[in-house]
Design a protein with these regions (language model features):
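Active-site loop/helix belt of alpha/beta enzymes
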Residues: 43-54, 69-190
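Glycine-enriched alpha-helix->loop->beta-strand junction motifs that scaffold or abut catalytic
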Residues: 29-35, 62, 152-159
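Short, charge-rich binding segments
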Residues: 26-29, 48-58
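Catalytic beta/alpha-barrel core
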Residues: 15-25, 31-45
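Positively charged, low-complexity/disordered segments
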Residues: 1-16
């Protein structure tokens, strides 16, 4: 819903829809939004929606592939990529715009070894995607803490999250920031 509201002629940048539910794919396709695909179930829902709602066989639906690099909640694991990429290559309507993952503990140096393993695995997985698809795919893994602590892993872009609101995920950085607003949301998945 937010993506459609933002669109409406006012936002001209690409809009990624995180965690799309199955009822939203018709709206996503009609409004040229770009869904995050984090499982084969969600990919199949996308293909079904394309078959139902896309009338122009040349229309490109941009997607963003979430990779599981260690959180084990959402995302494709390395062993799932060959099947996913085969399906994507055989669907002329689908184009991968980006692949991404999320760092579980970038704000805490206790987890630095794990974070570095996540970054290394992400680099391997994103290379598999780019090599198989044979076209450039944007890559991003850094959150607010990662931007500060792991600048070498900036890849093509970063996702400034809570830092955007003047809240540091690393304690010593907080003294240099000011709160700029209030953040409210709904729980979309447990």
């Amino acid at each position: 819903d937010e993506g459609v509201d933002l669109g409406g002629g006012r936002i001209i940048q690409n809009e990624m829809v995180m965690n799309p539910d199955e009822q939203s794919f018709d709206s996503i396709l009609k409004n040229n939004l770009e869904p995050e695909i984090y499982s084969m179930r969600v990919y199949k829902l996308l293909e079904e929606a394309i078959n139902q709602y896309v009338v122009d066989e040349n229309q490109q639906i941009k997607i963003h592939i979430k990779l599981d690099t260690g959180m084990h909640r959402l995302g494709f694991e390395m062993n799932e990529l060959p099947d996913l990429l085969h399906k994507i290559k055989n669907n002329p309507n689908i184009k991968v715009e980006s692949c991404f993952s999320h760092l579980a503990g970038a704000e805490n140096e206790v987890f630095d070894d794990f974070t570095k393993k996540q970054i290394h695995l992400f680099n391997e997985m994103s290379s598999v995607i780019c090599n198989k698809l044979e076209y450039p795919v944007l890559k991003h893994i850094l959150n607010s803490a990662g931007i500060l602590r792991f600048p070498e892993a900036q890849f093509d872009m970063v996702r400034l999250g809570i830092g955007l609101y003047g809240i540091a995920s690393i304690g010593e950085e907080q003294k240099d920031l000011e709160n700029v607003g209030t953040l409210r949301t709904i729980i979309s998945q447990i």
